Swiss-Prot record:
Locations listed in the record: Plastid, Chloroplast
GO CC terms of this entry: chloroplast; ribonucleoprotein complex; ribosome
Protein name per its UniProtKB record: Large ribosomal subunit protein uL23c
Subunit: Part of the 50S ribosomal subunit.
InterPro entries cross-referenced by the UniProt entry: Nucleotide-bd_a/b_plait_sf, Ribosomal_uL23-like, Ribosomal_uL23/eL15/eS24_sf
Protein family membership: Belongs to the universal ribosomal protein uL23 family.
GO terms, molecular function: rRNA binding; structural constituent of ribosome
Domain of life (superkingdom): Eukaryota
One of the GO BP terms on file: translation
The keyword Protease belongs to this UniProt entry's keyword annotation: no
Gene assigned in the entry: rpl23
Function: Binds to 23S rRNA.
Amino acid sequence: MDKLKKPILTEKSISLLEKRQYTFELDKNITKSEAKKMIETHFQVKVIHMNSYYLPINKKIRKNIGKLKRKKRMIFTLKVGDSIPFSSINMN
């Protein structure tokens, strides 16, 4: 679970919950097959579809001028009847 960083709770991701789609931030080196196995074993659900994307790189302006780390997110679509309760998500 160290490669699965945290669930994403934005306005868009909350609206996707109605379609059984869950958004997570992941380690940038993880593959789709590794992420699918991790979600299925940890939450005991069946993943039927996945989309991955990187957030755009932003520049720091305050103390140091440079680029922030690139972040990878994945949207997992679950089988009908499956869900991930947010009370079971512990990212510590």
